[in-house]
Amino acid sequence: MMPRRFPVAVDVPGLATRTALQHRRAWFQIGFFVLFVLAPPLDLFRLDLTRGHFILFGQDWTLGLAAFQQGLIGPLEAAWNLVWRGFVPLAVLVAAFIWVSWRYGRLYCGWLCPHFSVVELINGLMRRANGRPSVWERRPLPPQQPDGRVVYPNRWYWIPTVLGVLAFAFLWALTLLTYLLPPFEIYHNTLTGGLTRNQGLFLSVGTLLLAIEFGFARHLFCRFACAVGLFQSLAWMGNDRAMVVGFDTGRAAACRDCNNACDNACPMRLQPRTLKRKMFTCTECAECISACTQVQARVGRSTLLRWVEGDRALPVVTGRPAAQAPGRSPAPTTQPDA
C-alpha cells in the first residue's frame, strides 16, 4: 500500500479531472471575484461615506435631496427624484434577481458569489489536509475521486489551508472597507502602515471575524445567515417547475458501484438524490452532476443526475413519477432515499 501522505492517482484515459461545465463555472467565479475586488478602485460601484452617497460607473448617484434642502427644487420634484433615482432602480434590480431565483434557484450563489468561491476553495484545501471538507464533517470522505484518481489526506495541506483562510479573510475585509471609504486612500494607508485608528480597527476585527467564519462556519453562514441566499431559496421553493437537479430513479441500480460521489462533491453538504424541500440551500453549482457524469463515464454510461425544469421537475418536488405522455420517453424522476 502506498504511504498515506502521498496522493495516488489512477489515470482514466479520455477523462478530465474537471468537466467542461465546471471549467465554465470556474471562469464565471474568477471573473466575478475580480470584479468584486476591483469595483471600488475603478469607481464601478461603492458607497463613499466621505461624500455621503453612492458612486456608480464613476458618477455620483444621489437622490437629489441636497437641492431640496437648499431650496433649489420643490417638494414634488424632490419626491420624483426619490422615486426615479431610488425606488425604481432598486425595484427593477430586486424584481430581476427574484425572477432569476424563482426560475433557476440560487444561481448567483453557485456561479458568481465571491463568498461561495472562497467556501469551495477552502473545502478543497481542507479535504486534502484531513479528508474532510469541513471540521464538522463526521467522517473522512472516500479517497477515490469521481474521475478515478485516489487522493489520500496530507497533513502538510494544513499550511495552505490556514494561509488561505487568513489571506481571504484579510482580502475580504480590505475590499469591504474600500466599498465604504476612498479605495486609494485605504490601499495607500495599508501599504505604508498609515491606517487611521478606525480603519485599522475595521480591518483587524473584520479579518478576525471572517477568518473564524471561513475556517469554521462558512457552510453555516451560507445555509442559515446569508439573506441573499435565503431569499433566493424562498423564491425558488415557490416555483415547483423551477430548474432543479433530477435523479433518474429508473437506473438507481447503477449507484451500487459508486461511493456516493454526488454527495461527497456537494459543497453545501447536501444529498442531491432526494426531494427538493431537502435541497433548500442548493446553489445549482452542478458539482453533483459533474461527479455523476465522471463516475458513469468510466463505465461507459450516461449520468443519472441532470438539471430538469418544467413538468420534468415535478417528481423532484412530489417524489412521485411524472405522468408519461403518449409517444414520449419517461422523464428522470426523483424519490426520497430510503
Give a label for each model feature.
Residues M1-V244, I289, R306-A338:
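Membrane-embedded alpha-helical bundles of multi-pass integral membrane proteins
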Residues G105-C109, R218-C222, R251, C258, ...:
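Short metal-coordination and nucleic-acid-contact micro-motifs, chiefly zinc-binding Cys/His arrays
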Residues V228, C282-C285:
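Hydrophobic core positions of alpha-helical segments in small-molecule transporters
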Residues Q232-F247, R251-D257, N264-T281, S290-R306:
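Inter-heme linker and motif-flanking segments adjacent to c-type heme-binding CXXCH motifs
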